[in-house]
Amino acid sequence: MASEIFTIAGLSIVLTLVGVALGYGILRITQGGAE
């Protein structure tokens, strides 16, 4: 059971980092293109 908890926690952290990176990248592209 412990392994499942760590796996879920790891996946959630990775997905969160990926989401933040994508959002930041999109903002940079849109702002850079606008300027």
UniProtKB/Swiss-Prot annotation:
GO terms for cellular component: cytochrome b6f complex; plasma membrane-derived thylakoid membrane. The chain crosses the membrane at residues 9-27. Coiled coil: none annotated. The keyword rRNA-binding does not apply. The keyword tRNA-binding does not apply. It comes from the Bacteria. Pfam families: PetM. Keywords: Electron transport, Membrane, Photosynthesis, Thylakoid, Transmembrane, Transmembrane helix, Transport. The 4 large subunits of the cytochrome b6-f complex are cytochrome b6, subunit IV (17 kDa polypeptide, PetD), cytochrome f and the Rieske protein, while the 4 small subunits are PetG, PetL, PetM and PetN. The complex functions as a dimer. Component of the cytochrome b6-f complex, which mediates electron transfer between photosystem II (PSII) and photosystem I (PSI), cyclic electron flow around PSI, and state transitions. Belongs to the PetM family. This is Cytochrome b6-f complex subunit 7.
